[in-house]
Amino acid sequence: MAKHQAPDRHPVRDRAAIRTTALAMIGLTLFVIAMIASYSGAFAKPTLHHMSVAVAAPQQVVDGIRGQDALAVTEVGDDAAARAQVYERKTDAAFVVAPTGEMKIYVAGGGGRSVANAAEIVGRTVAAKAGLAATVEDVAPAAAGDPSGTVEFYAIIFISIGASVGATVVGRLMGAVRNPLTLALRTATLAGFSAVLAGAVTVYVDVILGALTGHTWQVFGALWLYAMAVGGAITGVAAAFGSFASMVLTAFLVVIGNAAAAGPVGRPLLSGFYSTFTAIVPQGSGVSLLRSVEYFGGNGAQTPLVTLAIWGAAGCLLAIVATASRVNYRAIYERFLPGSAGRDGAILRPGLLSPAD
């Protein structure tokens, strides 16, 4: 035997490793391209598609505004009612024609500077056609540290990444959810991590950026709920359908969900495709909830709260069903088919449920 013998090589194994690496690199490249295409399609050329406005004006002016396809008009009786519509998040803007021949334009910078700017342009155009002088009032201005009103969007999308990755890492470290105790530990760990994540983001946005106008604990609560909703959904899907399904959900949330959140441009400026998902994906609800508690006194928070609760509850339900199924199958096979368990106690599991999450 030679003193320095070359180690045995396994060509088949080497080819498989090369193929797996190549496929992973191609998949990652396609994922990056999909993100670029999604974000550029949503944000590169914002165009007004649908804006709701409250109007208190003579009928001729109301009819003229109603004739614009991109505007949905709600008629109100007076200035106070119009202003309230905007602050209560029932409309994106409001136009009021005073007896003095002046048009007052109510906008909400806290709901997104792009939307407020678009509303101002529309209002000034209407006023010019009617021969009216126009003034603008911001009923919910953004914080001085966030004049563009986009910090909420960035906080949400990066918490999405943290919650998704955190749920995956916790799953790998703690193992599959095979019994109620493991499920309880996973849930408690996820809740604790979500609190740390929400707390860190809240402190950074408030103390370092100075982008909060107050309501610190409400913002923390909204971020914690959002992180729990995303992390819980990822965990539940992984427990019930396997790691591949959770990866697909994560990719959907990153590629479509982040763009549908409409942070930099606002929902009225999104195309129909993305605006369809805004109220469905957790990102859209997270951004809306943050803005509601920070700038609008909690107005408009009910719908995003319900949406996030549904995402979290769905993930919890999937995890519970998956755990119960595994426990029941284990009991059945150990009772009626004792020979099916090997020396390591491995048992048959239903094909739908993955042992890994």
For each of these PLM feature ranges, what is it?
Residues W217-D357:
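Membrane-spanning alpha-helical segments of multipass transporters and channels
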Residues Q59, I65-P141:
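Extracytoplasmic loops/domains of multi-pass membrane proteins
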Residues I33, A191-G199, G312-A322:
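Hydrophobic core of alpha-helical transmembrane segments in multi-pass integral membrane proteins
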Residues D92, K129-V169:
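Membrane-helix interface and discontinuous TM-entry motifs in multi-pass inner-membrane proteins
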Residues F153-A262:
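Transmembrane alpha-helical segments that form the functional core of multipass membrane systems
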